[in-house]
Regions:
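Surface-exposed coil/turn segments at beta-strand junctions on protein surfaces, enriched
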Residues: 107, 119-121, 153-155, 165-167
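Glycine/proline-rich low-complexity spacer/linker segments in large multi-domain proteins
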Residues: 81, 147, 176-178
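Solvent-exposed beta-strand/loop surfaces of large extracellular or lumenal domains
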Residues: 136-164
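A generic structural signal for beta-strand entry/edge sites
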Residues: 109-113, 157-159, 169-171
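Aromatic (Trp/Tyr) and acidic
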Residues: 1-129, 135-137
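C-terminal beta-strand-rich structural cap/linker in extracellular carbohydrate-active enzymes
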Residues: 124-127, 162-177
């Protein structure tokens, strides 16, 4: 994970919107071509690069965006781990002795599972980002090892602290309303 000051959920929400609505959308899913630019007009079409006929200079610099996927999924501050993005991944945080696996189909499905594969013998805090569009009234829920936890969170756009002595095999499951 990247060391950070306490992440501001406003910036993480912006990052997530840019990732899904611009960076991922810049690549054609079937053939892999890239857009030269993303038009702002409603209903406008995109033109994707073709390897033999249209490979623009900006396509090369746009490729850099796709290397950013894993950079901000997790961040840490001291011994606190922040889960910023919901992307299938595995984190090995050697300094804290934590190995964590995240499973999700987000944004197609709002279920996110974090599995503790290795944990230190001391209390640690996981800070789970609650997106600005999610809150309990819309069906947001969290369970640890199958037991639903109740939290007072009237709105999204904040981090949910989960502090405990984590053990190998612990599973955190949360559902984001989609």
């Amino acid at each position: 994970p990247n060391q950070t000051n306490e992440p501001d959920p406003n910036y993480v929400n912006y990052y997530e919107r840019a990732l899904y609505n611009h960076i991922l959308a810049s690549q054609e899913p079937d053939k892999g071509g890239f857009v030269y630019f993303t038009p702002m007009r409603p209903g406008h079409y995109r033109v994707y690069s073709q390897p033999e006929t249209s490979m623009w200079c900006c396509v090369g610099s746009g490729l850099e965006n796709h290397t950013k996927y894993g950079e901000f999924i997790y961040a840490y501050r001291k011994d606190t781990l922040y889960v910023n993005l919901f992307i299938p991944s595995q984190l090995t945080w050697k300094e804290q002795g934590i190995i964590l696996t995240q499973e999700t189909r987000f944004p197609d499905d709002g279920k996110v599972t974090l599995r503790i594969d290795e944990a230190p013998k001391k209390k640690r805090t996981l800070m789970i980002r609650i997106p600005e569009w999610a809150n309990q009234s819309k069906g947001y829920s969290v369970s640890i090892n199958g037991k639903r936890k109740m939290f007072v969170m009237a709105k999204g756009n904040q981090y949910l602290p989960l502090s405990r002595k984590w053990e190998k095999g612990d599973v955190i499951t949360f559902h984001l309303p989609m």
